[in-house]
Structures are given as structure tokens and as C-alpha cells.
Amino acid sequence: LPICIAATLEKKVHIVLSDSGTSLQPFVDMFHNNPDYDDDLIINGQQAIEMVGNNAVLVVVDVNKPSITDCPELLRLCKSIVVFDHHRQGTEVIENATLSYVEAYASSTCEMVSEMLQYIGENIKIKNIEADCMYSGIMIDTNNFMTKTGVRTFEAAAFLRRNGADV
């Protein structure tokens, strides 16, 4: 989400990943090997802590519990926090969020983000790699479109395919 929006707004963006693990490594490698993206696109929590400034906006995706974010300290340091998630909220929530969009009926956070991108406007351009990542996120969370799917899921997938997803 933040990559294509930030690019349109000419803002610097970083993805904070403390440990990419084996499931995310192919995507991390795709971004690292793509000249369209800065070398410091994907950073760890400590690097993010060192970079945080007064105007930083922290976008937390696919989680709404502070204790399971990749870097809980960022939640204390950032004044502007946006949360996008499809998991039901429990008693532990990110309380200081400027905006919290939690939709438990969505199949995935990638579905929610895809829906939002459709309504932002024509000037937002999603790169193929970003569409691939979001499409893959939908596939993973729906077990290849077998569970938790609905019309919105397939509309989001179709939007991503129209915008370059080729998974």
C-alpha cells in the first residue's frame, strides 16, 4: 500500500521487517533486485527507530496487536499511525492510531488495500511487483481462493490482475 501512494506523493517509504523468514524472502529479493526501488526500501526495526522523525507516518498492516508488530517501539515513537487489518480486534489494540481500519469480514488485508486503491484515483500507479505481492497475500489468506472469499475478494483480485499481477 504505501509504496505506490508514497511514490505518487513523492514521499520516501520504508518497509520494516525484522525477519523476513523463508516465506517472505522471495518477495524481499524481488524488491532488492529491482532498480525501481531504493536499496533501503526494506529495513529492520532498529534502522526504522533511528530514522523516525516528527513527520513520519507509520502504516501497520495485517496486525492490530502492538505485541506482535515487528517493532513495537515504533508505535511509541510515531505520532501518526494508520492501521489496516482484517483480524478481529481483541483486548490488546494499537490505541494511539490516527486511523484504524479493521474489517474482520475481509478475506485479507491485501483485499482491503486493493479496494482502497481502486477509489483513490487514476493517478495512483501500482507496479507489477506490488500487484504481485498483494495478489499473493490474497491467495495465502484465502488458501488459493478456497476459504473466506466473497465477491469483494474476486473484485480485488481482478483489479490486481488488471494492474499487472501475474502470479
What is the predicted role of each segment?
Residues 1-11, 88-167:
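A structured phosphate/pyrophosphate-recognition subdomain
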Residues 3, 28, 71-75, 157-158:
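Short amphipathic alpha-helical segments and helix-helix/interface helices
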Residues 20, 66, 145:
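Glycine-/small-residue-rich active-site loops that bind phosphorylated ligands and cofactors
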Residues 25-28, 64, 131-133:
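Charged/polar interaction segments and conserved charged motifs
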Residues 37-99:
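Active-site cofactor/cluster-binding pocket
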Residues 26-27, 71, 94, 148:
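Short, well-ordered secondary-structure micro-motifs
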Residues 1-54:
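Anionic-ligand anchoring segments at beta-strand to alpha-helix junctions in alpha/beta enzyme folds, i.e.
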